[in-house]
Amino acid sequence: QDLSLRASEAGATITHNIPKHLIISGNYTLLYSIFHNIVDNAINYVEQANISIQLTNQDPSNLYFSITDNGQGVPAEALAHIFERFYRVDKGRSRKAGGTGLGLSIVKHAVIFHGGNITALNRQEGGLEYQFSLARRSR
């Protein structure tokens, strides 16, 4: 809810296909941080961001998600590092947007804690895509 308001204030839009009845088991704070930190980055670094949150697949063991934005993406050599603590792709721009460089590291550890994996890739049409899985039953 707070992300929708923040997105609206920043001129960004968020769409999703997450069913209202979907239950994700786990640590609420960590689960929230996964979605919040990825979406917050898009709002901070993409002018008039279009952000899409999709449940792309599910099976008895896992839920699979994709979060995309319409920004410029990141340099290919930076993709391998964006989940590292304190890593910033563009230090000058990052300083203006604020933050500590911990958001995506927190995301990665929260996904792992919930039995999943996460990757980030540049989309052919521009922007970033985060693909991640979460175990249906986590610790």
Residues of each region from the PLM?
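Short alpha-helical Gxxx[C/S/T] motif in the catalytic ATP-binding
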Residues: 103, 107
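Conserved catalytic submotifs in the C-terminal HATPase_c
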Residues: 8, 13-23, 58
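Short beta-strand/loop element within the Bergerat-fold HATPase_c
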Residues: 50-61
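Short helix-loop "hinge" at the ATP-lid/N-box region of the Bergerat-fold HATPase_c
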Residues: 42-43
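Short conserved segment of the HATPase_c
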Residues: 74-88
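Acidic ATP/Mg2+-coordinating residue in the GHKL
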Residues: 69
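Conserved glycine-rich
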Residues: 49, 115-116
